[in-house]
């Protein structure tokens, strides 16, 4: 018989840098999960992706055990990294703060494909392109 899930916690943490301090500690502590064990496992699985924010979905079971699924980094983080920026524009319609090429857009779309609502690259590129536009980043050919 499968274990019964008692809670699902979603967090976005820096890769390889999870610590028992907030937000991890309070989010998992209220479910009675071994926080240090989660931090060690998360850091081990994300060590190769340092510098990125990696969302994680943690399923917590009745016996206080847990499993977690790593998601792809947010499109905005990947776009900002490709454009060499820390953050997007505060006024994306009037102030353009950077640009990325179609090639960079395609590689970001391929990275994000498992977490998007589509299976084809051109549609994924449109989704990621919309995020870039909302960040005030131009897409060049």
Curated annotation (Swiss-Prot):
It comes from the Eukaryota. GO terms for biological process: translation. Keywords: Chloroplast, Plastid, Ribonucleoprotein, Ribosomal protein, RNA-binding, rRNA-binding. Pfam families: Ribosomal_L11, Ribosomal_L11_N. Its main location: plastid. Gene3D superfamilies: Ribosomal protein L11, C-terminal domain, Ribosomal protein L11/L12, N-terminal domain. It is found in: Plastid, Chloroplast. SMART domains: RL11. One of its GO terms (cellular component) is chloroplast. GO terms for molecular function: large ribosomal subunit rRNA binding; structural constituent of ribosome. PANTHER family: 60S RIBOSOMAL PROTEIN L12 (PTHR11661), LARGE RIBOSOMAL SUBUNIT PROTEIN UL11M (PTHR11661:SF1). Forms part of the ribosomal stalk which helps the ribosome interact with GTP-bound translation factors. Part of the ribosomal stalk of the 50S ribosomal subunit. Interacts with L10 and the large rRNA to form the base of the stalk. L10 forms an elongated spine to which L12 dimers bind in a sequential fashion forming a multimeric L10(L12)X complex. Belongs to the universal ribosomal protein uL11 family. This is Large ribosomal subunit protein uL11c.
């Amino acid at each position: 018989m499968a274990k019964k899930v008692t809670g699902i916690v979603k967090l976005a943490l820096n890769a390889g840098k999870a610590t028992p301090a907030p937000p991890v500690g309070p989010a998992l502590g209220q479910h009675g999960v071994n926080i240090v064990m989660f931090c060690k496992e998360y850091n081990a699985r994300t060590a190769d992706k340092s510098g990125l924010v990696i969302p994680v979905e943690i399923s917590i079971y009745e016996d206080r055990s847990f499993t977690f699924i790593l998601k792809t980094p947010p499109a905005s983080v990947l776009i900002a990294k490709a454009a060499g920026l820390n953050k997007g524009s505060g006024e994306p319609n009037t102030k353009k703060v950077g640009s990325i090429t179609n090639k960079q857009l395609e590689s970001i779309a391929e990275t994000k494909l498992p977490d998007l609502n589509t299976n084809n690259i051109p549609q994924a590129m449109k989704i990621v392109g919309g995020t870039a536009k909302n960040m005030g980043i131009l897409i060049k050919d």
